[in-house]
């Protein structure tokens, strides 16, 4: 399984049997490939403050790989009025160079999947073109609201879309933030 954690508020402690004990905070993204197997836990780093986060599990396209952990900072200024790719497929172009994630592509997972984050001014129009034919899209509104084909998506709304090549969104409020996940719709185990 490919497990992606995105803190929205506060921070989490990640601990696993591979020796990782890390704090992942708002403004960072954590990726773990469970591969051949790993025991792990995530919990709130603060005894008194609330933590909010997304944890997304994606079926991998390869089995029995060596488990791995990666954590990168997000350049939130780079996602202003544009979609910033934060996750792409392995061994995607420039996905890793000298063991470090390539700034433009974020980090990677064992799947033909793409994760994009963006924060938009009110009225800003966004076009997302699918990277791979046959993939589907899941939209998740983190903050604010977006319009899609006359439908309003509010904070914490999600929507799955299939059989399309392009989607067009419009930010309905100032500071509207969205996560766009593009994943295969069919089993693609190698």
PLM feature spans:
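Jelly-roll (double-stranded beta-helix
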Residues: 1-190
